[in-house]
């Protein structure tokens, strides 16, 4: 029996599945304030012709505010250095992610951005939520392209 996941991670996973169907790497994100999703996005690098169009970046932009200190970000994959930097600059309160990313991740892998003394903001960190489903989406997507 699988463990139920948060409805916010469930939404991020639905966005990731839609991204895969559109030919994008399956990553989705949802930004939550006061128990409600206020912004969401999936990877759209191919669709937008923009290498910075990661789900996290697009979600932060969609929120339309410089500071998001009262918000939590749910994302299906451990954020990369670019996205972790944006999360720090936006001062997001809590970061929840699904699958770890041993190659490109920057939270618990690689530069471990939020553990650096020069990082000006460190959100509360919660990894591994919905990790199995997130990892399966990524494996299936990339296996079909190799």
Task: Describe the residue ranges of each PLM region.
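Short beta-strand scaffold segments in enzyme catalytic cores
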Residues: 27-35
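Short, basic and Ser/Thr-rich N-terminal targeting/leader segments
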Residues: 23-27, 69
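Thiol/selenol-based redox catalytic cores and closely related redox-interacting motifs
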Residues: 137-146
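Zn2+-dependent cytidine deaminase-like catalytic core
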Residues: 39-136
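Generic helix-packing signal
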Residues: 16, 20-23, 33, 45, ...
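Short, basic/aromatic recognition patches
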Residues: 2-22
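Alpha-helical structural signal
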Residues: 5, 9, 27-28, 56, ...
């Amino acid at each position: 029996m699988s463990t139920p996941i948060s409805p916010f991670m469930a939404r991020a996973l639905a966005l990731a599945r839609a991204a895969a169907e559109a030919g994008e790497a399956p990553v989705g994100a949802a930004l939550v304030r006061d128990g409600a999703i206020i912004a969401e996005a999936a990877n759209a690098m191919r669709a937008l012709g923009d290498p910075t169009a990661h789900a996290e970046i697009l979600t932060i932009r969609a929120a339309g505010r410089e500071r998001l200190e009262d918000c939590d970000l749910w994302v299906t994959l451990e954020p990369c250095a670019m996205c972790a930097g944006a999360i720090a600059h936006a001062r997001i309160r809590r970061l929840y992610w699904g699958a770890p990313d041993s190659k490109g991740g920057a939270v618990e892998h690689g530069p471990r951005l939020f553990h650096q003394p020069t990082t000006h903001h460190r959100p509360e960190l919660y990894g591994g939520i919905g990790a199995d489903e997130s990892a399966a989406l990524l494996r299936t997507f990339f296996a079909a392209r190799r």
